């Protein structure tokens, strides 16, 4: 993992942060299956030389890099109002290869606007986000170096296929996507596939939270997304989903550290189906004492 960021003086009313981050891994074993049977398997190179190729890719040939890498360009602009409230606009632009690093993937990014109040109130914070991952540097990927002897000498660096890789399982943690929940995670695949099957998505998210006095608090989240499959495996019909969550908390003044929480959430649409859930929780944060010494 490597990153490089620059930030202006954060104590000033206006502050900007810009930079990029990149994560990758190499080595391991790749196994291919067909109809549940292993068809072939091979070990990928590892060692100090491969580590350097993964860490610092170069140009030229078919072995100019090693492993699987992905990352993002990040930009955040924050302004502090005179009353102490802050407004922050931010962008995270993903990349899987050189085309994304060179901003050839169009408008693809997470775009957000966030508000934070100087102190708790009816509206303590709010956020609006828009995500678009439909460009992916174009619909095709072609590199003549991948097919020795071909007469097609042109090159097309599209079909970035975010989060997926030919030789490795997708970037997921126990089947859940990393970085954004807008891309349906592999754990939801009903066919057992470990890849992301719907990474060409577009959607938005809104959230708001606040408090009514010192004992009551609320949070409301809502979002909508629409997906068209992947660049290499598009869906015949797009899928969509609407998700909503409402949360209420009670924090009695008589018992410091005690919270009683109720959440109601639901999904509706063809992407995940129609679902409804509820959560009731009692939390205590503090020191438990039984009697006095």
Where are these regions (language model features)?
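Secondary-structure boundary/capping signal
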Residues: 14, 85, 216, 254-256, ...
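C-terminal region/CTD detector
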Residues: 194, 270-273
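Signature for the C-terminal beta-barrel architecture of outer-membrane proteins
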Residues: 1-149, 204, 222-228, 237-239, ...
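Surface-exposed coil/turn segments at beta-strand junctions on protein surfaces, enriched
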Residues: 9, 80-82, 106, 199, ...
């Amino acid at each position: 993992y490597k990153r490089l960021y620059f930030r202006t003086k954060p104590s000033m009313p206006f502050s900007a942060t810009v930079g990029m981050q990149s994560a990758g891994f190499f080595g391991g074993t790749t196994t291919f299956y067909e109809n549940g049977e292993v068809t072939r398997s091979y070990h990928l190179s590892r060692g100090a030389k491969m580590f350097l190729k993964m860490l610092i890719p170069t140009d030229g040939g078919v072995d100019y890099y090693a492993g699987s890498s992905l990352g993002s360009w990040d930009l955040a602009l924050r302004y502090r109002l005179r009353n102490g409230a802050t407004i922050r606009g931010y962008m995270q632009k993903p990349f899987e290869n050189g085309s994304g690093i060179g901003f050839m993937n169009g408008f693809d990014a997470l775009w957000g606007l966030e508000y934070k109040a100087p102190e708790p109130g009816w509206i303590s914070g709010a956020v609006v986000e828009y995500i678009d991952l439909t460009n992916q540097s174009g619909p095709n990927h072609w590199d003549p170096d991948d097919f020795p002897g071909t007469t097609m000498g042109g090159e097309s660096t599209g079909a970035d296929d975010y989060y997926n890789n030919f030789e490795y399982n997708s970037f997921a943690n126990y089947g859940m996507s990393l970085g954004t929940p807008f891309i349906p995670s592999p754990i939801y695949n009903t066919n057992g596939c470990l890849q992301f099957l719907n990474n060409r998505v577009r959607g938005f998210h809104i959230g708001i939270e606040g408090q009514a006095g010192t004992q009551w608090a609320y949070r409301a989240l809502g979002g909508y997304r629409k997906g068209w499959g992947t660049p290499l495996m598009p869906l015949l019909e797009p899928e969509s989903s609407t998700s909503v969550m409402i949360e209420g908390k009670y924090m009695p003044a008589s018992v410091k550290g005690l919270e009683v929480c109720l959440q109601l959430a639901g999904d509706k649409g063809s992407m995940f189906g129609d679902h409804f859930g509820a959560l009731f929780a009692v939390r205590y944060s503090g020191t438990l004492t039984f009697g006095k010494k």
